[in-house]
Structures are given as structure tokens and as C-alpha cells.
Amino acid sequence: MTQTLSQLENSGAFIERHIGPDAAQQQEMLNTVGAESLNALIGQIVPKDIQLATPPQVGEAATEYAALAELKAIAGRNKRFTSYIGMGYTAVQLPPVILRNMLENPGWYTAYTPYQPEVSQGRLEALLNFQQVTLDLTGLDMASASLLDEATAAAEAMAMAKRISKLKNANRFFVASDVHPQTLDVVRTRAETFGFDVIVDDAEKVLDHQDVFGVLLQQVGTTGEVHDYSALISELKSRKVIVSVAADFMALVLLTAPGKQGADIVFGSAQRFGVPMGYGGPHAAFFAAKDEFKRSMPGRIIGVSKDAAGNTALRMAMQTREQHIRREKANSNICTSQVLLANIASLYAVYHGPVGLKRIANRIHRLTDILAAGLQQKGLKLRHAHYFDTLCVEVADKAAVLARAEVAEINLRSDIHNAVGITLDETTTRENVLQLFSVLLGDDHGLNIDTLDKDVAHDSRSIQESMLRDDAILTHPVFNRYHSETEMMRYMHSLERKDLALNQAMIPLGSCTMKLNAAAEMIPITWPEFAELHPFCPAEQAEGYHQMINQLSDWLVKLTGYDAVCMQPNSGAQGEYAGLLAIRHYHESRNDGHRDICLIPASAHGTNPASAQMAGMQVVVVACDKNGNIDLADLRAKAEQAGDNLSCIMVTYPSTHGVYEETIREVCEIVHQFGGQVYLDGANMNAQVGITSPGFIGADVSHLNLHKTFCIPHGGGGPGMGPIGVKSHLAPFVPGHSVVQIEGMLTRQGAVSAAPFGSASILPISWMYIRMMGAEGLKQASQVAILNANYIASRLKDAYPVLYTGRDGRVAHECILDIRPLKEETGISELDIAKRLIDYGFHAPTMSFPVAGTLMVEPTESESKMELDRFINAMLAIRAEIDRVKAGEWPLEDNPLVNAPHTQNELVAEWNHGYSREVAVFPAGVANKYWPTVKRLDDVYGDRNLFCSCVPMSEYQ
């Protein structure tokens, strides 16, 4: 044999699993595009002055099995103490049927945000169920389909309160002193850029303060007290103050809905509906408001509409509120939310139903009552008489109690003066309560659970009678039908079948990087060593997490060319906000706080201007030239005009037009010349890794979409992670945290997310990807992503003009197909092509971004030549169909394109079209058929007849 043992061990085996085209297929595609090799192609496309001489040294590739073993050893350094810390995070029991059929199912986790509703009806239905849960529990009229976390939701509530307040001269926001500290932290961060004054005081003192536009109360305080705020809310409403209430999903099963008490906005975390703590996330936040305020709400809202056949169909409603349309005037910069986690919570409610949820909530409360009764019998004092699941226990020798807790591998909340906090949850057992008695009282306490249970069962006054819920919840049939595992499994499968995800076809969305989310990368997220840690546990119990995070941070530093990385932002938009705050605070530290102008190219993603506005900056748009590049003359003029007020520029590279701009370093130099900073949006990092880097180019800060470039799945619209990389001068200004000191970060800035490391439990996905690819594999992934895009552009350019190209007519990792000439000639639009692609078994490319009337295609490196050819052939077949319309063979008002997509119901109904059923549903080359369950959505009907809760079951049948 001629192969060495090292070659036979094949440590780079995963590279060939991740990258779609093999070496022979790559050569075929290189021949098509007219390049000798990958290196030659990159040399033609990427400006030479920004090409790295060698790839960043992040180590050699490891096999899937070796990487898993290495990460398992790291995870083993975490200590899984039983957590009673609470503070918005509790242990859960995720039903195995949901774990296996959703969280571990690529049919759910590889889907994209449901901008194309015809291929998204399953997860849209699950999200509508989530909204119904929120409406029932909060007592309000309108709910969103999730926000990033509870603290972010609080900040959004404050911003919304200001938007809807009639007290236009008021500029103060009141926060009750017993909200969770991380919530207050994030609220203060947001308030600072908005110029709001935050007042923190006891809730009963709110009326003593003047010029208050909004109030934030917490129904169950951070130390456990259940508040009846009905009278206070009534008084605040009489003064036209907007009232927001933070609430707990599980507590709301038993407690009066804040909406019934008059609250305008109610929000909180849905984490305890089946989502593991995961050292802080990801978790979905819920958010609800009165109907009159619906157009001021942040985040995605799912609405009921109709399709072209008049059948009920679901869609994202009121999108004109959002960043991708309204840009800096949007209600929020939110793009990624937490769809996968919201759907877990939604299905948790479906599986347990109202009876099951009440049983769980009552069991938690009963055990808390038993714990309270036993402690009080033995002379310990509780701070609060009214509680749901949390006790604040005064202890004489706190150090001794905490020492016994550590020996018992128990975490209590320890930051309360002369007291400890104890939060119970659905995993708590009677044995756990006995162990808590021993920790707080000593082993000879002599207490008996059954005896205490009899006492409290007949005399529990721990929840005020006025605060006990007296209305039914979750009465819709969907919450009262699927309680056996068989029924639940089939329901989830029926939803999954309605959607198109990466397990069925490529999703060629430009600017979205829908690459492989490998099974080996996903496995660690459900390991209990990662899933079960509380984000505020002692640092010595999370040594495995810290090692993994530090190693990942070090790799990202090398890959980006920056000096430090902050892992806190839990979405790309959140990363933008955090990066801009770092720039803002850097300027302030130099007495340049007046620098508030942010230059943004006209082609920018909508989150850029929305994030700049959130960071307290003024947006000034920079023109692009006829080739789609930043107009340097206009940039220089705008920078000069801004002068000493220039804060920064936000630029994407390669550009959103799909080209490597030759002048990117000159762009950086111009901005630096006028005292500004360069924010390089990391959305297109998949075309940089191993080839160039933001730091090498000359940028100062970037966010990284780990859910794009580094393989965290999109989850149907979240979770995501958006850590920021910064140069050393910005490192002191990245987000900090009020509860946990972030190791290695000297920052004193406020937090942007509830948890110190954001959605920490999905970071192992990116760790695994980098570890298995190694330096050379990562570079090759970028090269093949660029090759695949150029192959598509080369094959399609005669049928659909490629709008922008760089040197030698090349594109970067994505290309924009210009549909406008075809529309002018034939009347067929980019929308018609997008919907017709569904009949061919594909998700549409990105429509009308960054240029109206176009389709932006990004194939990623994970798609094989066979799949690329299938897409190309579909696009060419569609072009032939357009030509038949142009030739008059099919009328413009009745052809397979304008009627697309076609459903099975339509196929078996009376056929009145001038083309055959076969042409409609089995067009040329379609073998792996995907069947949409609805026809094209009627967007106008949906927004004019807004309905955002569950419809009768008959509508689904």
C-alpha cells in the first residue's frame, strides 16, 4: 500500500462531508466558469491587497468522533449541581417526544424564517399556537411570535411605551426595585441611548415620581413575592402612564392575568415550558399588548389570512413595522427571534394541555408550600407571605447554610442580604425538599413531607385570593387533543410535512448562508453537561463552558483578525447594536460624545439603520455607483460634511450586491481619516473565512452570524448568535453583565442580553464546526461557496442577467439575478418566479433585496453539483415557461407562473387552466416532489383583516 497511516486515519474526513462537490465536481465547475483551480478563481475575484498569505491557524481538522470525544471531555468539567437559583431560569422536563421529533429533527431546525409562507405553514401554525398560549395566559389581545429573551423584551417594552405614550414631554421610565437584576441591566443599557431617565424604586412609590411615561412591574418579584398590582395599575392608567408587567408562564397558569388587571404590555420568558437552561439560552421571550397598540409592537407576528383559493392560510403579518422594510424607522432592529424555542414551548403547552399545566403548576406550588411550612415550623422567617415557587428565607448563619448546600451539590440564590433564595420547578421532588430541609436546618430536622402536605393542603394562603386565576385557559381544541405520545408524534409530523427545510432541498437565500448543520455539530447541545447549567451558577461549576467559550473566542479572534471577542449578543442584530454601542462609548471616553452620525450604504441590510437608530445615532445614506459599489466621492463628501460628528460607517463585505469591492481599504481609510470607526457587518463572512478578514481589511468591529457562517441552524427563524469581534481599543467597551463578571473582559458597560454569554448552549455547534474543519477546511469552504455561486451565475447569466459583478465578470458567494427586464417584457415578476420554484421543489431565493425586482441567490459550499444543477435546470425551465407567456402561448392572467404554487387539492379539483396538471405540479425534471399545502397568500387580506390567534380546527382540515 502506498498510503501512510496518517492518510488512512483521514483526520479531515468531515471536510468532505461538509463540502458538497467532490474534487471531480469542483473541477467540472471550474471548467464551466473558466478557472484552472480554486486558488486561481479566488485570485481573480478577491482584491490582492486583502488576501491573506496563509489561513488563520486554528488547528488541523479532527474527525467527527475525535471532536465529539474532545468536547465531551471539556463538557465533563462542568458540575451539574441542582439549581434553586431562579431569577428567571429553572430546570425543566422537556418531553422526549418533543426532544426527538423537534429539537433533534432537521425538518424543524434547518428551516428558515417564514418569509415564504407557502412553504412554512407547519411552523407558522406552531407559532400561532405560541401566540394563543401567550394571549390566554397574559389576558391581552395581541401577541408576537417571540423575542430574544426576557430582558430584551423589557427593553422593547420600554421603547414601545415611549412610542405609544400620550405624555410626549415625559422622559422617565420607572422600574420596580424587585425586577430581575439582568432585566434592569438591559433596560438601563437601552435607556441610555434613547436618552431616557430610569428610576428604580419600590413599586408603591411610583406615584411619587413625576414625568413618567412608562412603568415596569414584575408580577412575581425576583425574590419571590406575588404582587397584586390591580389598584396601582388602575391609578397609573388614570394618569395615562403605560404599564408593562414582567410575568412567568408557569405562574400565570395559576395567577390572574395582568391584562385583566389593566396592564398595557405583558412579557416574560417561555423557558420553563420545556426549554433547558443551557447556561443562559437560547430561550424564547413572549410579548403581548392591547389591540390598540398592535402596530407599535416589536418582533414577528403571525396572522391568519387566505390563499388564492380562499382557504385559510398563515403568514407573518404587519411586516411594514419591521426593519427589512422600515429600516431606521422600524419598531425594532429584530431580525432573528427564537422560533425553534417558541415552538418547543408551544408544543409543550399542546402536549400537556390546560389540565396537565395546572397539575405541574400546582405541584410546584404545593412543594413550595411544604418547604415554607417546614421552615417556618422550625423558626425560620420568610421575607414574603405571598409566593408561587420562590421563597426568600432569612438565615442567621448564611455561610454555614451555603457551605452545607455546596456539600450537597445544591445552588441557592446567595446575593440577598441575610437571606437565601430558593426557587422550585417541575423537576423538584419530595426528596429534593427533604434535602433542602437538611441544608437549611441540619440533618436532624425531623420533618415529614406527608404530614406537612396535609397541613398546607387545607390551609394554603400563599397566593392572595385576588390573584388566583378564575378564567379558563387553553380552551382551543389544539391544546386538548394531542396528549398521547402517538397523537403528539403524528401532529408534529403533520406540521413538519407542510414545510420545506434543508433536509429536503437547498435553500438558496442570498445573505442567509443556509449551509449544512451537521448532525455531529448538533449532538452536544442536548448533553446534560451543557443543557442543565444555570447561567448564574458559580464560575467553578462552569469550567467546561468557559474552556469551550474561550477556545471558540480564540479561534474567532484568529479568523476575524480582531483582538477580542464578546459572546453576549444573541442575534446578529443584537451584535450590531452591541458593536455600535462599543463605538459610541469609545467616542465618549475620548470626549467625542458628539460623534453620532453613522454612514450606511444604500444597499445595506435593514437591520443596519435600525440598529444605528437604537444606538442613538443619526443615519446618513451613502450612494452606490452604477456597478453597485460604494461611491467613494459621495462617501468622502458625506464624511467631510459630518466632520467631527462622524461616528462610524456600517459596511458589509463582500457587499450585499454580491461583489468584493476593490476599494474596501480606501473606504476604511476615508472614515478613519475623519475620526470615525469602521463597523464591518459579518453577514457575508462565509466569503471571507480563511481568505481575508475584517481586521486585516481595516475594520474596527464586526458581528459574526454564528447561525450563518459557523453552522448554528436557523431554526425556522432563530435561535442565532451574534458575537462581536473588536480591535483592542474597543475591547473595554463591549457589553458587560451586572450579575456575572465575564472572564477576561475588563468592560464596565451594561448588558445587551439577559445572560452573560447569550445563548451559550448552542456555541458547541460552532466549536464543533471549526474543530472538524480546521484551518484548511474552513478556507476551502469559503472557496467552494464562491465557486458554487459563480457556477450558478455562469449557467444562468444568459437567461437572467447578473446585475452586479466584480473583476472579470465574477461574483462573490452570491449573485443577484435581475428580473426587471423580463417583467417589463412579459409581466412575469420575481414573485411569480419565486412561487413557481416551489412547484419545482425549491425555496425561493431572496426577493427584492438589496434591489427591488431581483432575486439574490446564495448556494453555500454544502450543496453538491447535482443539487446546483437541479436548481439551475429549474430556473432555465421557468425561463422557458416565461418565453411561452411572452410568445402568447399562455395568457398572462392564466399560466403556471402566476398561478403558482399548485397544491394537491387543486390537482384533484376541476381543472380550468390552459396548461396541463402535469405541467403544473410535475414540471420538467422534478423527481423529489414537495407539496405546498396552500396556494399563494393574500397579503392584503391578511393585514386588512388582522387575526393572530388560533382558528377553528375545521380550518386545518
Curated annotation (Swiss-Prot):
SUPFAM superfamilies recorded: PLP-dependent transferases
The organism's place on the tree of life at top rank: Bacteria
Cofactor: pyridoxal 5'-phosphate
InterPro entries hit by this protein: GcvP (IPR003437), GDC-P_C (IPR049316), GDC-P_N (IPR049315), GDC_P (IPR020581), PyrdxlP-dep_Trfase (IPR015424), PyrdxlP-dep_Trfase_major (IPR015421), PyrdxlP-dep_Trfase_small (IPR015422)
GO cellular component: cytosol; glycine cleavage complex
GO biological process: glycine decarboxylation via glycine cleavage system
Positions of modified residues (N6-(pyridoxal phosphate)lysine): 708
Chain's role: The glycine cleavage system catalyzes the degradation of glycine. The P protein binds the alpha-amino group of glycine through its pyridoxal phosphate cofactor; CO(2) is released and the remaining methylamine moiety is then transferred to the lipoamide cofactor of the H protein.
One MF annotation (Gene Ontology) recorded for this entry: glycine dehydrogenase (decarboxylating) activity
EC number(s) on file: 1.4.4.2
Protein name in UniProt: Glycine dehydrogenase (decarboxylating)
Protein's UniProt keywords contain Oxidoreductase: yes
Family to which this protein belongs: Belongs to the GcvP family.
Subunit-structure text: The glycine cleavage system is composed of four proteins: P, T, L and H.
Catalytic activity line of the entry: N(6)-[(R)-lipoyl]-L-lysyl-[glycine-cleavage complex H protein] + glycine + H(+) = N(6)-[(R)-S(8)-aminomethyldihydrolipoyl]-L-lysyl-[glycine-cleavage complex H protein] + CO2
Keyword terms, alphabetized: Oxidoreductase, Pyridoxal phosphate
Keyword RNA-binding applies: no
PANTHER family on file: GLYCINE DEHYDROGENASE (DECARBOXYLATING), GLYCINE DEHYDROGENASE, DECARBOXYLATING
One matching Pfam family: GcvP2_C
